[in-house]
Structure formats: C-alpha cells, structure tokens
C-alpha cells in the first residue's frame, strides 16, 4: 500500500507520476519532528537492514553511515564522500518492521543511518 504524507508547504516537484491523495493522521513508523525544519527518527533493531539511496557510496546495507543527498558534480567518488551526483531519496528498512520511504524534497537532505 502506498501512502502519502505531507509536511510543511511543499511545491510540486513532478517526481511522482501518479496522483496520490494525502493521508491524514499520524505517520505509522518512527517519529516526525518539525521543530527545526523536518526530522524523521526511527529506532532500528540490531538486525535491521537499510537499502536504497541510489548511486550512494559504500555497500548495499546503508547502516552505520551518514549520507547527504545534495547533487554535487565532484569527479572523485571515494568512500569518504557523503554526497554524489544523483539524489535518490528512497530507502527501504527491512527487518522487524519493513517499509519504504521516499522523501520528495529538491534540496539538501541528510540520512544518518
């Protein structure tokens, strides 16, 4: 099931090709804070695996690193880089609870996984 939650006053980035109505109510996973911008916090179990973020460095499991989604045109893609050219703001948390998240945000995002 796909659900859409809206926070703040976003503008249409045209990232979604299908019109999805906004879901009312509380987000079912983790906590949302808007005190200092937007923050999503989810406490993972020890065995949870996180997939996604497109062309991000490191291995397939994204746990244990801080990724910055901020399109840069840096020709040196090394392990210590936190941001690469593409911004693919989609993750899947697989474990006790399994769910996916897409953050439709056209500016800098930090994923501290």
Q: Where do the model's predicted regions map?
A:
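Catalytic and substrate-binding clefts that recognize carbohydrates or anionic sugar/phosphate headgroups
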Residues: 1-113
């Amino acid at each position: 099931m796909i659900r859409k939650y809206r926070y703040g006053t976003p503008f249409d980035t045209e990232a979604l090709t299908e019109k999805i109505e906004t879901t009312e109510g509380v987000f079912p996973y983790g906590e949302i804070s808007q005190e200092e911008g937007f923050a999503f916090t989810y406490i993972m179990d020890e065995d949870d695996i996180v997939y996604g973020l497109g062309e991000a460095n490191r291995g397939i499991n994204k746990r244990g690193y801080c990724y910055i989604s901020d399109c840069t045109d840096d020709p040196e893609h090394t392990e210590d880089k936190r941001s690469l050219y593409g911004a693919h703001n989609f993750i899947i948390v697989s474990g006790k609870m399994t769910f996916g998240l897409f953050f439709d945000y056209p500016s800098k995002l930090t994923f501290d996984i």
